[in-house]
């Protein structure tokens, strides 16, 4: 691992990364519990579940898992190709809009509707989000796949023990916070499914609205403080 320069940890980017990993865990738990044991973010899990199902002759939800995997891949591919035209490079927050709108719609779709019409579109939106957001404070991370983040955590802590450079310690702590955020999203979603069942997904647009409003208020507060200091 290369030697990292000391970085000033951006509170804004860290909050956003924590929020995105929380949402990824939240949506994954929802689709796994409510929508046919399928994951929209953890595609490795889908491959394992699909393979085991095929061996055990349990192919009832195989099509949904295959379409979920393909949809996620298409989301990543399309955003990579068109992100500059869609202004996602300058405003990656725009990639959250499809997920928010779709979650709002799915919250009112009954469980009798086939999951192949529900989970793949969510996976497509998750592909957009995980492609648009790829770093926090200049450190690459993934808001959907925790295996890579776990590896980066241990690499960072290992490098800190070896070199005693504080930058590695800070990086390791960032990844720990991301892992905890993902777990909290899973736990929170799993608990809410007991109460709200399929409507649990409505928590996504609600949380996004609150988070976006807090970002706007924080930005306005900073601008106001700058004006006061200037005067």
Language model regions located:
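Structural signature of the two symmetry-related core transmembrane helices
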Residues: 93-106, 205
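Hydrophobic/small/kink-forming positions within alpha-helical transmembrane segments
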Residues: 69, 73-77, 179-187
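Short, Lys/Arg-rich, polar N-terminal cytosolic tail immediately upstream
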Residues: 1-13, 226
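C-terminal ends and interior cores of transmembrane alpha-helices
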Residues: 100-114, 215, 219
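Small-residue-rich hydrophobic segments that form or flank transmembrane alpha-helices
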Residues: 13, 17-60, 129-170
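Helix-to-loop junctions at the C-terminal end of transmembrane segments
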Residues: 76-89, 193
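Cytoplasmic membrane-interface "Motif A"-like loop-to-helix N-cap segments
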Residues: 84-98, 198-200
């Amino acid at each position: 691992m290369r030697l990292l320069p000391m970085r000033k940890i951006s509170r804004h980017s860290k909050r956003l990364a924590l929020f995105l990993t929380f949402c990824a865990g939240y949506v994954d738990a929802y689709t796994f519990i409510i929508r046919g044991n399928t994951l929209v973010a953890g595609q490795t899990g889908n491959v394992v579940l699909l393979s085991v199902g095929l061996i055990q002759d349990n192919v009832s939800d195989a099509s949904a898992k295959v379409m979920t995997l393909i949809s996620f891949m298409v989301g990543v591919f399309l955003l990579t190709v068109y992100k500059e035209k869609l202004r996602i490079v300058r405003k990656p927050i725009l990639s959250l809009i499809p997920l928010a709108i779709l979650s709002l719609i799915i919250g009112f779709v009954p469980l009798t509707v086939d999951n192949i019409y529900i989970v793949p579109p969510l996976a497509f939106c998750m592909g957009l989000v995980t492609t648009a957001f790829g770093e926090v404070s200049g450190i690459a991370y993934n808001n959907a796949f925790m295996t890579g983040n776990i590896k980066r955590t241990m690499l960072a802590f290992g490098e800190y023990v070896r070199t005693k450079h504080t930058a590695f310690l800070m990086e390791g702590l960032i990844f720990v916070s991301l892992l905890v955020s993902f777990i909290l999203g899973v736990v929170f979603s799993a608990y809410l499914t007991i109460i709200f069942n399929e409507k649990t997904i409505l928590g996504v647009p609600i949380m996004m609205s609150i988070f976006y409003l807090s970002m706007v208020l924080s930005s306005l507060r900073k601008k106001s403080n700058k004006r006061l200091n200037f005067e």
